[in-house]
Design a protein with these regions (language model features):
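Short secondary-structure capping/junction motifs at helix and strand boundaries
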Residues: 2-4, 85-89, 147-152
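Sec-dependent N-terminal signal peptides
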Residues: 4-14
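Active-site-proximal flexible loops/turns
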Residues: 9, 74, 235
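Alpha-helical transmembrane segments and their juxtamembrane interfaces
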Residues: 12-13, 77, 230
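Short, intrinsically disordered, charge-balanced linker/junction segments flanking boundaries
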Residues: 16-19, 235
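Contiguous, structured surface segment used for ligand recognition
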Residues: 19-112
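Aromatic-lined carbohydrate-binding surfaces of glycoside hydrolases
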Residues: 42-45, 57-64, 68, 93-94, ...
């Protein structure tokens, strides 16, 4: 009876760990059942560098890496170079994988610890009106591309608004200062103010909720979000 209880407890722990694995969840978003084709092992590296190893084949390929982002990057490597699949920011070509996966034995490592992504202009040109579904997709693609230090600028305008109000600015003055979403990049670089505004109150609430989801997912992967600091500009 005791042995059965220990076994049941162990299986429960495994199930919980699988459910909490962001790479497994990402693979299911890419294609139903895809997570079953990869075994993911997270192990630290003695030389303190990022790495991934691929080995096995047939029913399942094992991916060993020092973190979730490295594991996701390794899976993307395998899909691209062994399964001739393509998952990218511009679209996917991801057919059903063969019953017998191609055999593989590879190891790749890097001494580069910070892989930064995005800039202010890209943020405003591209992401200004994204919802959670689109951001979820983008964060998955970041992981598949090995990115571990993404910009996290969503909702910065809410921080500006709250801070200025606490410093005694009136709400009309704050609204006059902040620009519209398509111009946030230039506001955050200190280049302009007011253009495209004012923003409705509901916008700030929605962006705060969205940013919390974005940060939670980035941190699940082990990414280090980059936030906006104060650069000396005031109304």
């Amino acid at each position: 009876m005791k042995k059965h209880f220990v076994l049941l407890f162990f299986l429960l722990l495994v199930a919980v760990a699988e459910a909490a694995n962001p790479v497994k969840q990402m693979l299911e978003r890419l294609q139903e059942g895809l997570s079953d084709r990869f075994k993911i092992e997270i192990r630290s590296s003695s030389d303190e560098g990022d790495y991934f190893e691929l080995y096995g084949g047939g029913r399942k390929v094992t991916v060993r890496a020092n973190n979730y982002v490295s594991a996701a990057f390794g899976i993307n490597w395998y899909l691209k170079y062994y399964c001739h699949a393509h998952v990218s920011f511009c679209g996917d070509q991801l057919p059903q994988l063969p019953v017998d996966l191609p055999q593989v034995k590879e190891r790749h490592a890097t001494k580069l610890s910070d892989n930064f992504y995005m800039n202010y202009c890209t943020f405003s040109y591209t992401t200004a009106f994204w919802n959670w579904k689109r951001w979820e997709r983008e964060i998955d693609l970041m992981a598949l591309s090995g990115i571990n230090m993404p910009m996290a600028m969503v909702g910065v305008e809410a921080v500006w608004r709250n801070t200025l109000l606490k410093f005694g600015y009136t709400l009309p003055e704050v609204k006059e200062f902040l620009c519209g979403p398509a111009y946030f990049g230039w506001l955050l670089m200190g280049n302009l103010e007011n253009i495209g505004g004012p923003l409705p109150d509901e916008w700030f609430k929605e962006q705060i909720v969205l940013q919390k989801k974005i940060l939670a997912r980035m941190r699940e992967y082990g990414m280090k979000p980059v936030f906006q600091g104060f650069f000396g500009m005031v109304p």
